[in-house]
Every structure is written in structure tokens, then in C-alpha cells.
Amino acid sequence: MSLQLEKNLILELIPHFYSLGWMKFGSGNFCLKNNGYAICVKDRVQRDFITENDIVTFNLSNQSVTKDLVNWAYIFSWVLSNMDAVACIYSTSVAAVGASMYNEKFTTQSKEMIKGIPKGNPSAGYLCCFDTLEVPIIHNGDSKTILDELKKVIELYPQTCAVLIRGHGVIGWGATWEKSKTQMECYEYLFELDYKLKTL
């Protein structure tokens, strides 16, 4: 996909993610990989009114200039470079924050949308709806702390495609932009369902 097409995709999808409650108050992001570069939007920009001027492109191997515009530049770069990912989504939804309040991991089983989550490697297929899904949880902090915690927890959960950040939200990734989107839809559905079942 060309750089311009990816920019157009960001301009279309981020307002959509905003409408779902994933990216309120200028937070959250959708980051795409294009060869050795990453593309996302600036921090603290209204996600429902983004323009092409709000889009940032940075080198995956050198994010120092970009960090002032995108605080999570190092995190996005690491995920896109190390997790066989083409796209990642950072959501600060109410459901994700609620799911992040468990001790060490969010766990759910025997739910239909579990089958939308892959078994780690894209070639390994998908989970069954009767499987148990585990999403690890790390502590919140500055971007360096989150990245350090992310690296550690992925060593413990190498098959995961998402990590919750306590009191903050979730980051998820996929082998294509379509998979990152549909996987996050499944995660968000499961997070919200868990919350609603617990409040019955």
C-alpha cells in the first residue's frame, strides 16, 4: 500500500475508532508500517477531527525527533519491528481500562469472539471459541517504562496479540491492518462483555 493510501486509511479509521469509544480526548492511536517507516497521528489531536496535517511519519530505527509529537513512538516502533506486525492499535476505551484492573492478566473462556483472536503467529491459525483467552496486564508509567514492561511480559506470553496497561488501556497488533482492526474489535467486545456480566 502506498504512503498516501495509508494516510487516507488513517484519516478514515481513527474517527471511526473515536466513535467506538476507543480514542477519546486526543488519546489512542492507529499506527501502520510502510517499509522502514511508521505512520500515525500526533498526540493531543481531536481524533474525530483529524486532518492530513495531523499525520506523522517516522523512521522505525530513529524516533528521537518524533517523540515530542508521538509519545508512544518507541513503543509503536518496537511492536512493528518485533511482533510480525503491520499495524497496531492503542485504545483507551472504558472497557479496556476496566479489563486492566485484574491482578496479572485478563482471562475469559467459551465466548464466541475468542475465535477472532489468532494463536500468536499468523500461520498458526485462530483460537476456538471454547478456548481460554489470556491477555497479560502491565503497570502504567511513562513510555519507556511501558516499553520495558511490554518486552518483559511478551517473553512470558509470546503468543499474545495484545497487552493491557493498568488504568490506561490496551495495545494490540496484527499481521495486516485488517487483522489488527478485527482483532481489536474482538478484544474490546470481550472486555465489555466481561464488565457487563460482572455488573449483573
From Swiss-Prot:
One GO term describing the cellular component: cytoplasm
InterPro entries assigned: Aldolase_II/adducin_N, Aldolase_II/adducin_N_sf
Protein's GO biological process: L-methionine salvage from methylthioadenosine
Signal peptide: none
Single GO molecular function: methylthioribulose 1-phosphate dehydratase activity
UniProt similarity note: Belongs to the aldolase class II family. MtnB subfamily.
Stated name of the protein: Methylthioribulose-1-phosphate dehydratase-like protein
